């Protein structure tokens, strides 16, 4: 029993992990189609409802009629004047009504691993079922007259297509003599710069506030789990990082962190995001809200404090709009290049940020070296093993020493019989004399749990893992192994029930776990022996729904652990009992005497 103490600790902790996984991932995933169907039905049934969009106190943003979702994407795009967008990473257009970013596709990403599948659509017009857009406007007063808002028709006054080398200029002059010139530029990835020059040609000073919002009319259909944040996100100056789920604003009032100077706001999905970086020198209020009138929609917005433009003078305000894939090096570069506070938190690195991000950096380095993220996972596992080698050496050395004193422990058990207190005291004295810490092997297991979670986060949340192939049938390391033993791995023409799907890599992982546990003899207690025997089987089925990259890591880590334990035990002069244990397991047991 003492020899297997550390394994039972590991098993108990792992079971907790896997139960949580089943609760937070597998069950929600089974309802994914139902949720998607309900959302689609809701979008189809919604009819146009006139009326202005509501606003929370202190956040009175211009609104307008809420359009129905009765148009196709092509119909909605075709009915308005637009400026085309064409970059190496993006294609789409800007709607001249409201200068709205509501047509954007990501050239470098497709919906599935099939290279002929459609590219990812990020933004779509409000008139479509998947309406999702970003816009920037102003709030004035009677003195300012009409200012740019959702219904403003801008004039294209410079350029004809937005590319990294050709910005475009939009202009609008109101009835009071205030001129707005908007210059929009874009880089070769996902960042737009929106620079507004506001000139006051009236005889009196005017004050106006800028606003910006990211609005979407639906929620993503990916399973909602606690290891991943999808919803509202931003950094509100001194109030720090804000992560607000969709359900929070559905059930409660809008979330308003408070007045901020510096920061950003937006909406994030697992791999994609849309954010606005307001003018950093002017204080602003951020709000995350849900509106249920007409078509339900979710909105992340800001409103700045008013700026005053003197007669005959002009001011310049710059907003940044990020719309695209959350590529780690791109996001990190934007944080530095534009001095955006904590912009790297746009990617959900989790609680173990200090481990997760360096681990990604390591894996990304090996990927660039070898060109395969699967290979990068294997090499990263070796590096982690080397880092933890001193702890593992101590763990296995402690286990070896425990085996050495096993005969003495058996003698003590016979000597003390049912005197458990006396036996415990005698064993503690034996540990002291032999310089053995019976809990020494537990710490390496506990310390490595954050590493496991960090690796899981890297594989699950970073877009670099999306559709990243390994070898053979693994074409997406972020998805479960697509094979299943139910149909003999594709030889039979049926799929079988989803809960019985068991791929090749989960089976390999189960075998390695079985061998690792057999490095030690089966415990004498019948209950523990049953747990010892069946745990690899349970883990095999539970890990069938894990991302393939994580299962490959676990199988490889088990293999390295078997080799490591064998080498250390040989160095300690302790017999490696793997083959003897396997032989005793599969050999015929003698029949009990009658």
Curated annotation (Swiss-Prot):
UniProt signal peptide: none
Q: Which GO terms describe its cellular component?
A: plasma membrane
Q: Identify the domain of life.
A: Bacteria
CDD domains, per the entry: 5TM_YidC_Alb3 (cd20070), EcYidC-like_peri (cd19961)
Residues spanning the membrane: 7-27, 369-389, 443-463, 488-508, 532-552
Keywords assigned by UniProt?
Answer: Cell inner membrane, Cell membrane, Chaperone, Membrane, Protein transport, Transmembrane, Transmembrane helix, Transport
Per the UniProt entry, what are the Gene Ontology biological process annotations, in alphabetical order? protein insertion into membrane; protein transport
**InterPro entries in alphabetical order:** Membr_insert_YidC (IPR019998), Membr_insert_YidC_N (IPR028053), YidC/ALB3/OXA1/COX18 (IPR001708), YidC/Oxa/ALB_C (IPR028055), YidC_ALB_C (IPR047196), YidC_periplasmic_sf (IPR038221)
Quote the subcellular location field of this record.
Cell inner membrane
> What topology does it adopt in the membrane?
Multi-pass membrane protein
Q: Give the GO molecular function terms.
A: membrane insertase activity
- Fill in the subunit field for this protein: Interacts with the Sec translocase complex via SecD. Specifically interacts with transmembrane segments of nascent integral membrane proteins during membrane integration.
Q: Which family, according to the similarity comment? A: Belongs to the OXA1/ALB3/YidC family. Type 1 subfamily.
Q: What is this protein called?
A: Membrane protein insertase YidC
Q: Which organism is it from?
A: Rhizobium meliloti (strain 1021) (Ensifer meliloti)
């Amino acid at each position: 029993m003492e020899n297997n103490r550390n394994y039972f600790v590991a098993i108990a902790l792992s079971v907790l992990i896997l139960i949580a996984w089943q609760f937070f991932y597998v069950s929600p995933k089974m309802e994914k189609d139902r949720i998607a169907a309900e959302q689609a039905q809701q979008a189809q049934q919604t009819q146009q409802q006139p009326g202005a969009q509501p606003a929370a106190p202190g956040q009175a943003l211009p609104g307008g009629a809420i359009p129905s979702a009765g148009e196709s994407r092509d119909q909605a795009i075709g009915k308005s004047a637009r400026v085309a967008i064409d970059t190496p990473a993006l294609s789409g257009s800007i709607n001249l009504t409201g200068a709205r970013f509501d047509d954007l596709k990501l050239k470098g990403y497709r919906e599935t691993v099939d290279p002929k599948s459609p590219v990812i659509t990020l933004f779509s017009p409000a008139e479509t079922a998947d309406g999702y857009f970003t816009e920037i406007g102003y709030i004035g007063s009677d003195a300012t007259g009409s200012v740019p808002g959702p219904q403003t028709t801008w004039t294209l006054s410079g350029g004809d297509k937005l590319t990294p080398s050709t910005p475009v200029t939009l202009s609008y002059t109101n009835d009071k003599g205030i001129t707005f010139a908007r210059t929009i530029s874009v880089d070769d990835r996902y960042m737009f710069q929106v620079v507004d020059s506001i000139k006051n040609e009236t005889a009196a000073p005017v004050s106006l506030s800028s606003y910006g919002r990211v609005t979407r009319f639906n929620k993503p259909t990916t399973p909602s789990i606690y290891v991943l944040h999808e919803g509202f996100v931003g950094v509100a100056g001194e109030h720090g990082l804000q992560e607000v789920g969709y359900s929070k604003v559905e059930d409660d009032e809008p979330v308003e962190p408070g007045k901020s100077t510096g920061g950003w706001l937006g909406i994030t999905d697992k791999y994609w995001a849309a954010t606005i970086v307001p003018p950093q020198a002017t204080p602003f209020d951020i709000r995350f809200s849900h509106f249920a009138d007409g078509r339900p929609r979710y909105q992340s917005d800001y409103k700045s404090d008013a700026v005053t433009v003197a007669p005959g003078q002009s001011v310049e305000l710059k907003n940044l709009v990020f719309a695209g894939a959350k590529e780690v090096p791109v996001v990190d570069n934007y944080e530095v290049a534009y001095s955006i506070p904590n912009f790297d938190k746009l990617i959900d690195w989790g609680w173990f940020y200090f481990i997760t991000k360096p681990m990604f950096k390591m894996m990304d380095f090996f990927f660039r070296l070898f060109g395969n993220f699967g290979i990068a996972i294997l090499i990263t596992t070796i590096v982690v093993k080397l880092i933890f080698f001193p702890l593992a050496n101590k763990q296995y050395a402690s286990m070896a020493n425990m085996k050495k004193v096993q005969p003495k422990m058996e003698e003590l058990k016979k000597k003390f019989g049912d005197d458990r207190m006396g036996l415990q005291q005698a064993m503690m004295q034996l540990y002291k004399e032999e310089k053995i810490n019976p809990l020494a092997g537990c710490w390496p297991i506990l310390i490595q749990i954050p590493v496991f979670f960090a690796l899981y986060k890297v594989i699950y949340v970073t877009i670099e893992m999306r559709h990243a192939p390994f070898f053979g049938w693994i074409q997406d390391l972020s998805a479960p192994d697509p094979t299943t033993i139910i149909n003999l791995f594709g030889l039979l023409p049926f799929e079988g029930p989803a809960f019985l799907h068991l791929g090749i890599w989960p089976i390999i992982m189960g075998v390695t776990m079985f061998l690792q546990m057999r490095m030690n003899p089966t415990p004498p207690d019948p209950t523990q022996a049953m747990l010892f025997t069946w745990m690899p089987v349970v883990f095999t089925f539970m890990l069938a729904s894990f991302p393939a990259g994580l299962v490959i890591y676990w199988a490889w880590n088990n293999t390295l652990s078997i080799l490591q334990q064998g080498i250390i035990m040989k160095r300690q002069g302790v017999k490696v009992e793997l083959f003897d244990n396997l032989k005793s397991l599969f050999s015929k047991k003698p029949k009990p005497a009658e």
